[in-house]
Amino acid sequence: MAGVTNYQKQGAVQNTGDQLALFLKVFSGEVLTAFTRATQVMNNHMVKTIDSGKATSFPVMGRGKAHYLPAGANLDDLREAIPHNEVVINIDGLLTSDVLITDILEAMNHYDVRGEYAKQLGEALAISADGAMVAEIAKLVKANKENITGLGKGVVIEKTLTGGAGINYDTGKAVIEGLLEMKAKWTSQYVPENERFAYITPEVESALIASKDAINRDFGAVASIVDGNINKLCGFKIIAVPHLKAGGADKTGMLGTAPEGHVFPTEYAKALAVCAHRTAVATVKLKDLQLEHARRPELQADMIIAKNAVGHGGLRPEACGIILAK
């Protein structure tokens, strides 16, 4: 008997081509949704997309100066050139997260695993990206350098906590004081007052609520003890990041002869908050988040891969800061 050819191909577009095409789109959407929900930093910094190449540069300019021009004097004698510099951010390589789903185990399974796998693939890439960007903020502070003389360096504010950091009044009070000091320091370095972000752990967020001042309506705080979250404080948008100090993915496999990787500095292990303006760090995208499906007949399995090719780096040290417990 000849093989049946007129069966219904639910996953194929108009019954032709890839029989999994339509199924994959659903899975891809789930990965993208999971990535968007999990990332806490991606929308709060600069992103640049390139069509080709291994790196891109961001120009850095200093500040001009004003001079009084006496009668009969020449502007050429007073003019001071505005200093320039550049920051280069390299593509890190191809970052991947994948699953291998065998036919026999999927057939035996009594529940659907693909939805959860989609979530895990998206979250893996999101957490890696978040960790890398927060690490780059901290690395700019640790470097203690200026892009151009006079623009300013990263800010470290140390707060003494006798009993150690915890979900308590003292920790919350220390963070509020630290944010106020950071606000003053940044303003003195001409960091724009809008789009300032403070990344904290969930424990620090709870400590802020425990301090009461953060949710005190008399102080105009944008927070709620009912929901247990804080939106804005001292001019900073407050964002709780569970993986605050995790850093990026392991640097093994990154491009370059001796890549540094995106490792959160151990010196800041007691950081209460990592602060940054939107322009402090940047991501360069060569390949945005994509999903690839491959049939592995030799294994009788489906392989699903989420991937992107991006690079992360610091731009403006003067717009970075750490609030550190000691």
Predicted regions and their residues:
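N-terminal "assembly arms/tails" that initiate or stabilize quaternary assembly
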Residues: 1-87, 320-324
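Extended, compositionally biased alpha-helical segments that mediate assembly or anchoring
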Residues: 2-8, 285-326
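Long, contiguous amphipathic alpha-helices that act as assembly "spine/axial" helices in icosahedral shell
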Residues: 58-60, 83-149, 153, 187-202, ...
